[in-house]
Amino acid sequence: MDETVKLNHTCVICDQEKNRGIHLYTKFICLDCERKVISTSTSDPDYAFYVKKLKSIHTPPLYS
Amino acid sequence: MSRNKVEICGVDTSKLPVLKNEEMRKLFRQLQDEGDDSAREKLVNGNLRLVLSVIQRFNNRGEYVDDLFQVGCIGLMKSIDNFDLSHNVKFSTYAVPMIIGEIRRYLRDNNPIRVSRSLRDIAYKALQVRERLISETSKEPTAEDIAKVLEVPHEEIVFALDAIQDPVSLFEPIYNDGGDPIYVMDQISDERNTDSQWIEELALKEGMRRLNDREKMILRKRFFQGKTQMEVAEEIGISQAQVSRLEKAAIKQMNKNIHQ
């Protein structure tokens, strides 16, 4: 996949538009966030934040 | 192609891609030699089934499963980054224990109440023994029965089983018929306002009813308003000794009234 196609993807964790990263199931995670997530230990308070953010990959948003 | 949809944690398993072992090795080579992002993407998505299968092991343990998918995915991404092709094993061989480890750590670190390892072990053993005893004798075993099998004091069993209970919100709804829901809070009794106390109050009222006004007033000031004998004496213009005497007589009278 070339980079122009990937442009304008919004990362689920930092909510910023990034061009490098991966799609995890339905959502996009930018390279920087992925690195951060992977190096976070489960006891880190940030971990709970990532888990919360990543929840949207398998729970569709509720529209009212 | 079966039309049956299997959904785990909101993920439709039939839509997940599957990778063959050779494909996976090729992708890993691409990732590790060239740092190819798309290879990693394919590897992550191609192994999501692995995460789901691991989550299912945690399904019937009474733990909170909702967030485990994300945790599993993080575990999967960690294992993809650390996988070493030179060990010549299948990726799943390496990834499954990694994902399980990640989930275990997550559950341990995110429990609202920290329970010591040994206590937790006792509790899990107790639960197993309980299950076994139920299937053998088809009745609920007592804490003593479990304690006898595990050879620990039965207080320990009770304590351990208590410790692994999940805390529950007072506002957790337990029944909802569309109207006002019933919360856990509504079913907790108020220990300060129980029946026996209510009966005592009735008896007290009955006892006081037969006293004369002066005695009633003194008792009210002394015991309901918490005043000292000196204060009461000053207020109604008698000596403290008189208050003491009247009080004693009134209590004696009340005792007689209640117990007769």
From Swiss-Prot, chain A:
Gene knockout outcome: Premature expression of sigma-G factor (sigG or spoIIIG) activity during the early stages of forespore development. Spore formation continues normally. However its absence has deleterious effects on strain robustness and is strongly selected against in competitions experiments.
Protein name, as recorded: Anti-sigma-G factor Gin
Subunit structure, as described in the record: Probably functions as a homodimer. Interacts with sigma-G factor, recognition occurs via the first 71 residues of sigma-G.
Keyword list, A-Z: Metal-binding, Sporulation, Transcription, Transcription regulation, Zinc
Signal peptide (UniProt feature, chain positions): none
Binding site for Zn(2+): 11, 14, 30, 33
Record InterPro entries: Sigma-G_inhibitor_Gin
Cofactor note text: Binds 0.5 mol of zinc/mol protein, probably 1 zinc per dimer.
Function: An anti-sigma-G factor, prevents premature activation of sigma-G factor in the forespore; overexpression leads to 1000-fold reduction in spore formation, spore formation stops after engulfment. Overexpression also inhibits sigma-G transcription activation activity. When both Gin and sigma-G are expressed in E.coli Gin inhibits sigma-G, strongly suggesting Gin inhibits by direct physical interaction.
UniProt source species: Bacillus subtilis (strain 168)
Induction section of the entry: During sporulation under control of sigma-F factor.
Positions in coiled-coil regions: none
Effect of residue 50 to A: Partial loss of sigma-G inhibition
From Swiss-Prot, chain B:
Top-rank lineage group of the source organism: Bacteria
DNA-binding span(s): 229-248
Keyword Transcription: yes
PROSITE patterns: SIGMA70_1, SIGMA70_2
CDD domains assigned to the protein according to its UniProt record, in alphabetical order: Sigma70_r4
Regulation: Activity repressed by anti-sigma-G factor Gin (csfB) and Lon protease during the early stages of forespore development. When both Gin and sigma-G are expressed in E.coli Gin inhibits sigma-G activity, strongly suggesting Gin inhibits by direct physical interaction.
Pfam families tied to this protein: Sigma70_r2 (PF04542), Sigma70_r3 (PF04539), Sigma70_r4 (PF04545)
Induction line: Expressed and active 2 hours after sporulation starts (at protein level); stimulates its own transcription.
Keyword Metal-binding among UniProt keywords: no
SUPFAM superfamilies for this protein: Sigma2 domain of RNA polymerase sigma factors, Sigma3 and sigma4 domains of RNA polymerase sigma factors
Renumbered ranges of motif Polymerase core binding: 67-80
Recognizes anti-sigma-G factor Gin (csfB), as annotated region: 1-71
Keywords of the record: DNA-binding, Sigma factor, Sporulation, Transcription, Transcription regulation
Known function: Sigma factors are initiation factors that promote the attachment of RNA polymerase to specific initiation sites and are then released. This sigma factor is responsible for the expression of sporulation specific genes in the forespore.
Subunit (UniProt): Interacts with anti-sigma-G factor Gin (csfB).
NCBIfam families registered for this protein in UniProt: PRK08215.1, SigBFG, sigma70-ECF, spore_sigG
Stated family: Belongs to the sigma-70 factor family.
Domain notes: Recognition of anti-sigma-G factor Gin (csfB) occurs via the first 71 residues.
Protein's name according to its UniProt entry: RNA polymerase sigma-G factor
Source organism (scientific name): Bacillus subtilis (strain 168)
Gene that encodes it: sigG
